[in-house]
């Protein structure tokens, strides 16, 4: 693949708050680029990218569908991502492998909570983005008000490239500020027909004012363009587009376009903007290699960068796994090199080789087989036996490990068991496959009850998993009520010595360990330090001590919840030449943990959620009073027209079934979103309640 064709690839994501119109916009893009001959509608349940049955029924996008399409001699790989917070893992994964993103903002509500969350994720990965203010045909739509929320809530330099002509049911087109013309859509033909005309006289002054702002902002990042402007009093369209692209890629500003995807207006100029302003794989630096295993991530560290070069050794990142009727599909973003069907690559994350079977370019759930893939491509591989999400695949000539992915902590548990004994093995295999696809889903067995416990990001997330278990794997399951994923930790330092001694004829068991337990900051995890000197505990037994603590930490001393955020330091111990063994030291470490933790100020932690409620003005009192009863801490309130946005932090335990309460309290007029924020110790009375129940 030549450099020119690499410059004609765009890997983009489409992301937004739930119901802002992502999937509808993607459907229009596929229609206008010729991939689909009929436009699918979310409310009809026949969209191309929402191809899982649950998505079509619920009208939301659950998994990131990868779709390839062509526009004006360019190839665009689009990832349509979910807007519901329970599926944030999908947004995280897709932003990680994209070169650019289109953020869709609702023209009535402006920036909503999930948009803010996704925006912060895109900031983390330095993804260049353009903004599309959608649904301008809706009653109550206001381009300028929605635009103001971009500056207020995202704290960005938002740069309009278009202004709407008309609003609500009078919306007919846009003023293009780059070329200073009006683009007006004609009726019929599903929005495929539009024409240019003069800017309406009543908008000309406003258009000139916004055009001047566009020139001042865009040319501030382009010295040659600024010189051209000073010489001629204006700049060529190509110069202005070049400056806008430079500022978009650097993040100096964020271009803003507008339209209504549902009414088929504004999508073609959006596609043009994707080509004009979002980067190709060669426009950006490339991907950094990961720091060595165990070394802290340091953003300022000067790590090697892998540029997009099809002639370099192969390097790619597996970012999604899907199990379907054809087997396991592993979605890979190719960063460097060329790979052919049948080639063998090295999984450098896990240290083993994988043979690539067939490779496909995906059009939602339809596929087109390809014989080779190159730097810049996104493709699905068949035949990989043990490659997980976030694993690097590389040539053995240059076995790099690419930047690793971080996955969120599940906050909600359910127990699940098959309705028949015969289905036990079938259910276990199915859940292992589902957990392999979704790193935010955790699977474990309760040691006391033998029950299978599923941990996920929210009730909807786990609902969908159970639904998929039934539909895709034919397993009917009994599901327990959702439970909060509590954790335990310690609040003070304590040193514990424990001796394990067992003599029952023949060789016995002996091991002694002295361990200091210390609390850590939230999210620091479990840290181990070995400070044994003089061989008091032989080196070969140190891993057994580590294993004992890690295994025992899964069952906390208060109520059996996993223990987190502590450091343990092995400082001394004793061994016996004959009776000591790895098993003896593992047993001693487990018992030392049980005894030591009881004396280190153990507490139970609960997940605290960020909750945002949008309610009519006349129900604010009821909503706030109800949140207070739920142990909520009100953060702030913000009026927006006739509605009020109430932001609070509330324990997850108090939020189960909240939607039905909110609906009855506000006669169905309020809505809310919620996402995990942090873990906090539970109040004493609730801790007692939890411990009594677990006993």
Swiss-Prot record:
Alphabetized InterPro entries for the sequence: EFG_II, EFG_III, EFG_III/V, EFG_IV, EFG_V, EFG_V-like, EFTu-like_2, G_TR_CS
Family under the similarity heading: Belongs to the TRAFAC class translation factor GTPase superfamily. Classic translation factor GTPase family. EF-G/EF-2 subfamily.
Domain tr-type G: 7-282
Sites where the protein binds GTP: 16-23, 80-84, 134-137
Record Pfam families: EFG_C, EFG_III, EFG_IV, GTP_EFTU, GTP_EFTU_D2
The protein, known as: Elongation factor G
Location(s), subcellular: Cytoplasm
Keywords, in A-Z order: Cytoplasm, Elongation factor, GTP-binding, Nucleotide-binding, Protein biosynthesis
GO molecular function: GTP binding; GTPase activity; guanosine tetraphosphate binding; translation elongation factor activity
Major location category of this protein: cytoplasm
SUPFAM superfamilies tied to this protein: EF-G C-terminal domain-like, P-loop containing nucleoside triphosphate hydrolases, Ribosomal protein S5 domain 2-like, Translation proteins
Species this protein is from: Acidiphilium cryptum (strain JF-5)
Function of the protein: Catalyzes the GTP-dependent ribosomal translocation step during translation elongation. During this step, the ribosome changes from the pre-translocational (PRE) to the post-translocational (POST) state as the newly formed A-site-bound peptidyl-tRNA and P-site-bound deacylated tRNA move to the P and E sites, respectively. Catalyzes the coordinated movement of the two tRNA molecules, the mRNA and conformational changes in the ribosome.
Superkingdom assignment: Bacteria
Designated gene of the protein: fusA
Cellular component terms (Gene Ontology): cytoplasm
Classification lineage: Bacteria, Pseudomonadati, Pseudomonadota, Alphaproteobacteria, Acetobacterales
Keyword hit for Cytoplasm: yes
NCBIfam families: EF-G (TIGR00484), PRK12740.1-5 (NF009381), small_GTP (TIGR00231)
GO terms classed as biological process: ribosome disassembly
